[in-house]
Amino acid sequence: MACLLEAPLRISVLSEVTATSRHYVDRLFDPDPQNVLQGVIDMKNAVIGNNKQKANLIVLGAVPRLLYLLQQSSSTLELRTECAVVLGSLSMGTENNIKSLVDCHIIPALLQGLLCSDLIFIEACLRCLRTVFISPVTPVQLLYTDPTVIPHLMSLLSRSQHTQEYITQIFAHCCKTPEHQTVLFNHGAIQNIAPLLISPSYKVRMQALKCFSVLAYENAQVSMTLVNVLVDGEQLSQVFVRMMQRDKPIEMQLTAAKCLTYMCRAGAIRTEDNCIVLKTLPCLVRMCSKERLLEERVEGAETLAYLMEPDIELQRIASVTDHLVSMLADYFKYPSSVSAITDIKRLDHDLKHAHELRQAAFKLYASLGSNDEDIRKKITETENMMDRIVSGLSESSIKVRLAAVRCLHSLSRSVQQLRTSFHDHAVWKPLMKLLQNAPDEVLVMASSTLCNLLLEFSPSKEPILESGVIELLCSLTQSDSSALRVNGIWALMNMAFQADQKVKVEIVRALGTEQLFRLLSDPDTNVLMKTLGLLRNLLSTRPHIDQIMSSHGKQIMQAVTLILEGEHSIEVKEQTLCILANIADGNTAKELIMTDDDMLQKIKYYMGHSNVKLQLAATFCISNLIWNEEDGSQERQDKLREMGFVDILHKLTQASDPDLCDRAKTAMQQYLA
């Protein structure tokens, strides 16, 4: 019987709750304005801390009525203010609540309310707007829809500490793109917000600081302007340095360090400046220590990784600051063993941040080890480091996988590591698995790493070859992403270097001549350069040159002609002439050049070019064609003499460039022998 009674009981309780909520909404429609005001005040008291009540009132249609009352010119200022306060309270509920408020067009209504002159009403509207805008479900673009909004918000900054706090918080949350940065910059964000950094209110100082961190991120224009800003006679960078002092709240230290990091990365502060080397870097290393909260350690590590990414000196300094390399190993120890955690909340917290910690540690290791051999050695010798990277490659979190492969890529730049750690841990296996099915950003990093693993001195090259990687790499060359096409062809180029004939034939077969020639006309110069590099490596020993040219000679000569005639860089043309020199070294392949007078004229033209690199490559080509010890050399020498090549060679023996002069003399000796 109890089961039968339960349902009706539930319904009656629900009806009661709904009836109470309905009563609040009904009072908003009372014809007596005084009753309406009292109804709004009672509603305000009823919803404080009561998410269920908030949801009920939203479902029952309270929001459109509150917005109507807020916008009515006939409403008293007190009523309008109370409506804004209730809406602010409703917005502090769940994400669904905020979605409903946004759908009811709360944002334009509140922005309109800011045109009122009454400060208390303005503050109530701003407080609600702040809560709505900092929610992840609110489209930030809504702040920028009406072009008059940003300048009006700037003008309200001087009204009170509350307007300063709410407006800077809105800006800090809604500045997500370079376009947003530009809008705020153009409307005077820097000069309006800078004085707030010395406000007596901590909240105002903090939000102003956050504003500068999002404005300066990857923005040279903002960063260059910030360097010259004075706040109460003090340079802004020095204000940030003061905010990083150990006695300041961690949130402030971290955000100030971010501001200086972003200004440095944007080129506004030199990496060797004291405020970076002696202040920002040590502050960020401190943020990585065990004493800090997990989320602070994540932010500290990621910011530090970004700061030193392009600078080898900062990497070296960081690697010997506070045992950073071993300190980061601790990032992998979360969540702690379950038995040691009695607090379930703590376990939940650790689990939530474990992925982020691993991701941050991998990013920082990648940045630390991107240039210096000793640092890479230090990283790989850290406890279980290679095992951690390997397991990171197969984590469920895509961000951790990306950070792990980025770390692996950084370490793979080391010849020593490729020969030792990478081989010992068979890193190529999980890497190949990752390449089978991953988003493009992971594929780009994984294929870059694979390029390094396929270098001729890498012990991983052989097992990778045997695993059927050629087909995979050929498929990458057909990608829409130019970065993936570059990496696919680059890996094939490394694979073809000093490879045996079997591998070369397999590459040509798998790639297909059509695709090879498509890559030779790729709009991306990097793709073209690597494809030429592949071709040069394929055509590298006489039997290989003759075999490939016997089956694909016509198309290769055609491609060479097109490139030499086209609008290409010196590097591209030099690489193409080197391919021609390789063809000229073949036993039978050289006839493809000798029977092509048009090609010979092109070589002649490049021997007289203003660029020494092109002259060298073209002269090398002729040198190979007239080499004495080969069959038919006399006929070739005679033909080239008739075409005027000897006169050019003679002239080049007087060249100012010693290499060109030597190469021309070597060629001339073939005629004298």
Swiss-Prot record:
InterPro entries the UniProt entry points to: ARM-like, ARM-type_fold, Armadillo, ARMC8/Vid28
SMART domains: ARM
GO annotations of cellular component type: cytoplasm; GID complex; nucleus; ubiquitin ligase complex
One of the GO BP terms on file: proteasome-mediated ubiquitin-dependent protein catabolic process
Subcellular location: Nucleus; Cytoplasm
ARM repeat residues: 51-92, 95-134, 138-176, 178-217, 225-265, 269-309, 313-352, 374-413, 416-455, 458-497, 501-540, 543-585, 588-627, 634-673
The entry's keywords: Cytoplasm, Nucleus, Repeat
Gene3D superfamilies linked: Leucine-rich Repeat Variant
Keyword Cytoplasm: yes
Description of how the protein assembles with itself and partners: Identified in the CTLH complex that contains at least MAEA, RMND5A (or alternatively its paralog RMND5B), GID8, WDR26, and RANBP9 and/or RANBP10; ARMC8 has an ancillary role in the complex.
Free-text function comment from the UniProt entry: Component of the CTLH E3 ubiquitin-protein ligase complex that mediates ubiquitination and subsequent proteasomal degradation of target proteins.
Protein name from the UniProt record: Armadillo repeat-containing protein 8
Biological source species: Danio rerio (Zebrafish)
Taxonomic lineage of the native organism: Eukaryota, Metazoa, Chordata, Craniata, Vertebrata
